[in-house]
Amino acid sequence: MATTPYFPPLFAEDFGAFTPTVLSVATALAATAAVRDKAGGTALAERQLLRDSGLLTLAVPQAFGGQGAAWPLIFRMVRRLAQADSSLAHLFAFQQLQVASVLLFGSPAQQDRWLGATVGQNWFWGNAVNARDTRLQVTRTEGGWLLDGIKAFCSGAQDSDVLNVSVTTGPEPTDRLYLVLPTGRTGIQVNADWDNMGQRQTDSGTVEFRQVFAADHEVLGPPGAASSPRATLRNTIGQIILTEIYLGNAQGALIEAIDYTRTQAQPWVMAGVDRSVDDPLLQLRTGEMWATLRAAVALAEEANTAFQQAWEQGLDLNETQRGEVGMLVAAARTTAAKAALQITSQIFELMGARATTARYGFDRYWRNVRVHTLHDPLDYRSKEMGRWLFTAEPPNPYGYG
């Protein structure tokens, strides 16, 4: 009697009470991800799916009406959604990052106002924060500030309700203001000019500001962006998000490659087997990729746990502890990047030439990872780790620290 073989799940899919929602959203996103990757543009229907899912308020504390989910759980969700659709995972993750910005920089009254509205009005946040783009100028005026200029890499600005905006006020990395502005504010123009080879639907194009007024109460703080080691954890969240997007793409690529090899790949004539899955070289390569990815995931989980512990320390977090977390996160990111670049390329060695047909879109995993690994040079991450090991000097926590 024939039996159906049991294939164990390659990766854990436990998100506690949120498991049904996360898997439902991931399944829906995966169904059209390859087609939408080719189209680019703004994924309006999929953004609405995220709105309707209730997942946009995960990082909002329960005191403001949110779920108050722990960061390691949120990061695992980013990974799982990136497995299905890297662009929408990016938007989901950046939503949580903007919420964290309000928690880290905002006054109690600002937190109550903007996080309460995030829940009550189901806000989708965008950003115009890119620290390296200093073309956005700010001048003091009565009762606030005037913004003129442009910001690039403004992920999620399209179709957003509110923007987290940063402006440079001086030469030091700490000379920055963070502002919260409605996307529809007079003078703000969100441009549909994102057309990169990967992360095709993150809407990471430019936002222009023409004599945009920002009232004093719309500037986050006190405490502000440079008030304590805790405040610099925003940058750490950004680094972890990149790590999880790498890992999610690698997971998606490996799962698709295994499925394709089982069902469609033709064995190589010299392998001496009737099925590709019986080719010992393909078995070897697949086992190596799986082990590489599992090791990278384990390191990421360790870093995420350390981050949660740092987050919970609040203002008691000191510079040394912040540096240790930063180095662990850097180790996770560099390891995940190497693993993901390797896996998203090597899957074609399993599947063969037919798998390069454009309709499959298997190359999107590599393109997504390649774009995101260029966010800031990984060699400098490794250099910082080496310097820290030799001298105990922690990374600069500002900018990309």
PLM regions: where:
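Glycine-rich phosphate/cofactor-binding loops in nucleotide/flavin-utilizing enzymes
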Residues: 349-401
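Glycine-rich flavin
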Residues: 44-51, 57-159
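Charge-rich, acidic-biased intrinsically disordered regions
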Residues: 47-48, 270-278, 309-328, 353-371, ...
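Generic structural signal for well-ordered, non-transmembrane alpha-helical segments
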Residues: 23, 248-251, 287, 291-294, ...
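C-terminal helix-coil-helix/basic helical segment that borders enzyme active sites and/or dimer interfaces
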Residues: 34-37, 295-334, 348-351
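A short core secondary-structure module
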Residues: 153-190
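Glycine-rich beta->alpha junctions and the first turn(s) of the following alpha-helix
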Residues: 197-294
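Glycine-rich phosphate/pyrophosphate-binding beta-alpha loops
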Residues: 153-157, 238-242, 375
